[in-house]
Amino acid sequence: MRAVQIAGGLEQILDLGVEYAQQRTQFGRPLGNFQVIQHQLVQLAGETSTARAAADLALRIVGGANEQFAIAAAKARASAAVAPAAAIAHQVHGAIGFTQEHRLQLSTRRLWAWRDEFGSEAYWNTQLGRMALDAGPNSFWPALAVSHVKQGE
């Protein structure tokens, strides 16, 4: 499932960004001590966690009543996270992140490829809209809330 791969790739670039911000010093202090870098890393963590949550939910309900809806939502959310997450990771790293020797560029190039495989976020958002319209007005909230997922699974 591409959404799971994307979520894992996002976690990797988040880890690389945090590690770099802790190690790199600028103006006599770690880059991670600057508030703007902290804010960027929090935004990256937010994109990562929402993609991971959507992918995890889709995995948990495979075979369930709303499987297709959850899979579409996971791919749409994970794909939508790629652009802002990659931009933030490269901003934190600066030019070093674009060099051939650095792992960041390998991860972000792979994320960009996965983003469009099996349909972009626009495609999956369209599918979600169609599923919601086809299900009717009384079915959308139960599908969205996935109340059928058992606690503790």
Predicted regions and their residues:
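Alpha-helical interface subdomain recognition
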Residues: 1-153
